[in-house]
Amino acid sequence: MASLIYRQLLTNSYTVNLSDEIQEIGSTKTQNTTINPGPFAQTGYAPVNWGPGETNDSTTIEPVLDGPYQPTSFNPPVGYWMLLSPTTAGVIVEGTNNTDRWLATILIEPNVTSQQRTYTIFGVQEQITVENTSQTQWRFVDVSKTTQNGSYSQYGPLLSTPKLYAVMKYGGRIHTYSGQTPNATTGYYSATNYDSVNMTTFCDFYIIPRSEESKCTEYINNGLPPIQNTRNIVPLALSARNVISLKAQSNEDIVVSKTSLWKEMQYNRDITIRFKFANSIVKSGGLGYKWSEISFKPANYQYTYMRDGEEVTAHTTCSVNGMNDFSFNGGSLPTDFVISRYEVIKENSYVYIDYWDDSQAFRNMVYVRSLAANLNSVTCTGGDYNFALPVGQWPYMTGGAVSLHSAGVTLSTQFTDFVSLNSLRFRFRLAVEEPSFAIMRTRVSGLYGLPAANPNNGREYYEIAGRFSLISLVPSNDNYQTPIANSVTVRQDLERQLGELREEFNALSQEIAMSQLIDLALLPLDMFSMFSGIKSTIDAAKSIATNVMKKFKRSSLASSVSILTDSLSDAASSVSRGSSIRSVGSSVSAWTDVSTQITDVSSSVSSISTQTSTISRRLRLKEMATQTEGMNFDDISAAVLKTKIDKSVQISPTTLPDIVTEASEKFIPNRAYRVINNDEVFEAGTDGRFFAYRVDTFEEIPFDVQKFADLVTDSPVISAIIDFKTLKNLNDNYGIGKQQAFNLLRSDPRVLREFINQNNPIIRNRIEQLIMQCRL
């Protein structure tokens, strides 16, 4: 059987220890070498004055005032004050437990007569009457309601000169401040599930532990302490005082400071960012009515543009984060239109654009400070994508739009096919725009965001104009270059290769012929035949096998075998020590791991689904230990892996160990196993689903967890290649005899091949589903 490859890897993986020891000895023999670098040596650090360094101890000191943090939405920890520091009037914070408390705080500027204003609270426009008769102090007002559709009431105003406010979750209550500074005091609101209250802030805030509540009260009444600023004193010649200060221009290089070896250069640049989205559309196997995935993926774009009369060559990489997964299911029939998953970016998503150009600013970008950028916004609108069905009108996805707004800039590294580039990463927050998107000829409509189906809408690129400024530490002599701190390493390059290889492997699932797959699954694949398709020399075959085993030794499957071996060893010890039947039953539970849960059902906190799922996770190892004549999931997994290795054009000796290990862990994640007891069958899956039924009628019977656990220990475990639902569907539509049913229950490969050769749609659809689960 094809799963022989996994057994060989598990059996022989210990032999790589010798290879590890040889490498370790070789490395230690070459480490004790002393080199005198002379008075000048290249280091990986900027020139600094070295002090004594840090002195570490075991004391952890919690800061009194932690921050400031930018506006965000999160669940604050219990027992910590959130000190809010707003700059403008309006809603500054809102929070709810989504049950019986909706609370928001509004800041009102001084000298406001009673008037009605419109505020957006929890995404809804609310009309609230506010006033502030104070001529100098700002007024904080809490507005609260106890039902989602109720009206807001005002509580606990705080008149504040420092313009600070604080909120804390503690003791089943939400604590705030009220009164008038400098004599403000704390108050509270009761709330159920107070620890799950999510807070959304619309201003900068600080975090103060409850143990320092007196400090928080001091800040509320008197204001924050002055932030300590570092001041550098630089001696200047008298003649330097006559230098006229000039305003920085759009594109210029300014020498900020200079020593004999290093100088600080300020680079100001106008930039034009062009980018595009890329996507991956994967169609499921079968009759052509189903799509498994429509997703975003990073996109590189290279272009040129003019800046101050100079042609600039630029390179961008666009990637997205925080995607929203949507799906559409038109029905359960093989001819029903289905999209298992399609990604949409919305207001909770981010777009990252890494930018590099060939100007002087990026030549020595290693040590950088004072990085800032101003960029315009851009709107991205989705286009149409047709789902080409074999028969009938084609559904198509259309519309969708988001606008990108600058949210910060950091340093990054772009990895191209040939070189790594130290770049600037511009982060953009998103806002949804009109139009909404829909899947025409279905009932999906009026959804907002930008789907991955056609995010560029026929455009070659989107464009953003702006400027950035940074100060970089570079050598004083322009002919020298600093070392690239984030250059391509072997591992980073390997990760890029693995990413491309995973995409190729997943796309190859549609090219596998099922009849050939069954034949291949029956072959005893060993390491030589499995890796024979790799383009490599015979001399490298041993090193390939060694590297695969070395990687496989650290896989979750190998770890499970090791844990199970320890469990069986402990079980054997307990059998030898105990003489009662119960001690023997408990010791054998290394296979099931739920005997203690089943012993007393009344005290068990786990459901049947949880228990069967727990047992099922061990059944793969049980099946490996007790081979049967039937085909199992690992046979199909290994056959698909072999087919994809032979078809792949990107597989190499360096990527093979990772691919084989990932395949053993990730191929066919949803598995079901069965045990047969006379005419009764017990079947349980790793997803928690379980069935018990009779062979002759496929009539379901009550599922006895204790009996199932006993049978798992004493009987052969069989992969449910054709699961119960497929068997019942086959019997209802075609009718199968008792002997045929037994053969399918035992996963007899001869019977499976007959059904596939007869083009039975139910069996073919089941095998196709298993093939499509072979994804990395």
Curated annotation (Swiss-Prot):
Motif (KID motif): 644-646
Span of the signal peptide: none
Spike head: region residues: 65-224
Spike foot: annotated span: 510-776
Sites marked Cleavage: 231-232, 241-242, 247-248
Keywords, in A-Z order: Capsid protein, Coiled coil, Disulfide bond, Hemagglutinin, Host cell membrane, Host cytoplasm, Host cytoskeleton, Host endoplasmic reticulum, Host membrane, Host-virus interaction, Membrane, Outer capsid protein, Viral attachment to host cell, Viral penetration into host cytoplasm, Viral penetration via permeabilization of host membrane, Virion, Virus entry into host cell
GO biological process: permeabilization of host organelle membrane involved in viral entry into host cell; virion attachment to host cell
UniProt feature coiled coil, ranges: 484-511
Residue numbers spanned by region Spike body and stalk (antigen domain): 248-479
Disulfide bond entries: 203-216, 318-380
Highest taxon of source: Viruses
Residue interval(s) of motif DGE motif: 308-310
More about this protein: In group A rotaviruses, VP4 defines the P serotype.
Official protein name in the record: Outer capsid protein VP4
